[in-house]
Amino acid sequence: IDDYINAEEIVDFYNKNIDLQSLKILVVVNTVTSAQNLYLHISKQIGKENVKLLHSKFTVEDRKNLEYEIIEDGKYENNKHIIWIATQVVEASLDLDFDFLFTEFAELSSLFQRMGRCNRKGLKHISAPNIYVYEKIAGGLLCRDKAGYGTEKKGFIYYSLYELGKAALHKWKLQTSSSEMSEEDKICMINEFYNREKICEIEKNSSYSSYIKDYYDRYDRLIEISGMDIQDSEMQDSFRTIVSINAVPYDVYMDNFDLISSIENEILAKR
């Protein structure tokens, strides 16, 4: 779909298909903020009891409970009417089998992981499209070099992989005689479009960050530090471009104030 993912189309789809025996919809977006905004808009229109949210910024306990809930809702045998809105946290490790998927575009490997959360077992009869991919994404998600953008690299999706991924899906759509994408189709797209020659051609005159350059920079860094005694924090600085700060919600902090104070006092006493 040549558009940005939006609440209106998801709500419209939900309402039009309300008579289905099972209407389990998984919505996957690229940022926590997008997930939160979609949740607010969709839950306002169809009710909070039918919409749930999962992302990486929940407290450990809340996220554990939500992961249990989404796994239960996402079981093949559970027929429900529910919309789950999530980020990349559902791409791996969670065994989910939803009826429909609405997703923002990401590079192909991430996109295929998301697709695997819809009709996972391949046992559901499919008479109409069950996966909707929205090609347009916010420009701020595309990787930019540090120069002119502060001390940190901006974005986390490589422009070259984004453009080649779209080209791969367009070619598949034009050439296939089936509306079902096979595992062989996915492998062929990766091999044909995510190769060095095509990536370099896209990046030749691009102002965006170079996937090829970053790949070899990190490879050289890995060779450099192999065998060295290096701390986890240093490893993350070398290979992880996302900067975040852990925080405790105020009400959680106050509920555990005595315990936290006791631990702090024990630490101070040992110094």
Q: How would you label these PLM feature ranges?
A:
Residues 23-27, 52, 80-84:
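Generic beta-sheet signal
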Residues 12-16, 28, 33, 37-73, ...:
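C-terminal helicase lobe and adjacent C-terminal extensions/tails of nucleic-acid helicase motors
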Residues 1-20:
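Interdomain hinge/linker at the junction between the two RecA-like core domains of SF2 helicases
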Residues 76-91:
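Conserved two-lobed SF2 helicase motor
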Residues 92-96:
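Short loop/helix-cap segments at secondary-structure boundaries that form the rim of catalytic
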Residues 100:
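Conserved phosphoryl-transfer motifs of two-component systems
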